[in-house]
Structures are given as C-alpha cells and as structure tokens.
Amino acid sequence: FIAELFPELNKAVYIDSDTVINDDIAKLYSVDMGDAMFGAVRDTFAGKNTILAHYIENVVGIERDEYVNSGVLLMNLDKIRQAHLADRFLKLMAEYHFDSVAPDQDYINAMCAKEIYFLDKEWNVMPNKGGEYIARPKLIHYNLFDKPWHYSEIPYEEYFWQYAAESGFYPLLIKQRKQYGDNEKKADRENLKKLLARAENIADGDGVKFSDVVGSRIVVDSGFVKDSSDAAK
C-alpha cells in the first residue's frame, strides 16, 4: 500500500529490516527499469530448492527462475496506482483466501509476473550456504534463519559485524548470539522443515492456487489495465 500512502511519489525503494547496505542506495533508486511495475532480484534459494521450485511452478504459477524475492523492491508507484494493484490484491485475498508460504511475495510474483524487471543480483544477496558467492554485494539480505546475530560462520557476516561495531548495540548483539542456544537453533531447523512441508502440501493439495486464477495477472496496454484473461480474448 506504499503507492496509496505516498501519492505524491512516483518511485520508491522498499527494503526489509534484516539487511545491510554496502553501496549508495541512490544507485538502486536510479536504475532504469523501463515500464515495469517492480524491480527485484531472483530468489535463488527458492528457485534451487526442489520443494520450493515445485511450489513456485504449481502454486504461484510461474517458472522457478522468474520468482523474485520481495525483501528488496524498486517500485514504480505510478504504474502500481494505474493498475489499481492494492484493490486487486484485496479482492483476490477476500475472494480466494489463497494458502501460501510467503504471502506478500507470492502475490507480487503471481499478480505481476510480467511486470517485473530483474535487478542485478548484487542488490539482494542472500547468505544461503552452498549458493553462489558474490564478491562485492551491494545489499545483503539475511533472509530466513541465516542471521549473523544468531549464528556464527554465516556467509557475508563480516559486513553485518562491521556496521554493528559502529553502533551502540554491538555488546547487546554479541550477547544475543551467545545466548542463542540449542533450543532456539533446533526450533529454526524445525520451522524450516515445517515451511518446506507446508509448501509441498499446498502444491499437492486441492485448494485454490494462484495458478488457478487466470485473471490474477495484470497486463497494462497503452494505459488501459486489463486482466490477462481479457488480453487473451
């Protein structure tokens, strides 16, 4: 609802709180994303995980390598308002009550799949173990459970601790990591298992999925907003 909250703005950057910015954020704001509604980075963790990839393709209804992470968004607010995206979102949510594992992220991917500009991966680097290492990350997103204030040896943790040391919260953060014990870590592992199990159950279940609702995608043609179902007629 950022577009409605700030009607005087035509563009905005949204960033999750579990992030570290290593470059001038104005560079992200200045990216030319053409006529796209959103600029975002592909979610490599979700796309490479077998269960989540199955979920993306069967529930969200898009290809796994087109699914983006909504933790960092460049937003074309004029286009979002033009498409009445907030109203469409509320209508879909009220009518279908989609079951999903990442509600806001899934809605953006399902509704706006053809309106997303893929940003350079350096603008949303996630510390997933086994993933591609980015030598010069512009923005690090400590997504899911890989938080350096909870765990040691997290990829890109040095950037977080560099800035933490310059803040007044460094001693508290060190204490918090030391106190994050076996019970908390076990809970994280169990929660990840539950998330994956839920994704699998939704994908293989009989409930209404985003992919079942053809008209949920937005097509903007010469300033006139239509559902993709209309565009196909």
Model-found features: residue ranges?
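A short linear-motif detector with a strong N-terminal bias
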Residues: D16-V20, T50-H54, Y96-F98, Y117-E122
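GT-A fold catalytic core of metal-dependent nucleotide-sugar glycosyltransferases
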Residues: F1-K48, L74-M75
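A short acidic (Asp/Glu
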Residues: I25, I51, K129-G130
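Surface-exposed acidic, glycine/proline-enriched linker/cap segments
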Residues: G47-G61
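A glycosyltransferase accessory/donor-loop signature
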Residues: N69-S70, M75-K233
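Short, surface-exposed, charged loop/turn segments at secondary-structure junctions
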Residues: Y29, H54-Y55, D87-L92
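A generic fold-level signal
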Residues: P7, Y14, M33, D65-Y67, ...
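A generic local secondary-structure boundary/capping motif
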Residues: I2, V60-R64
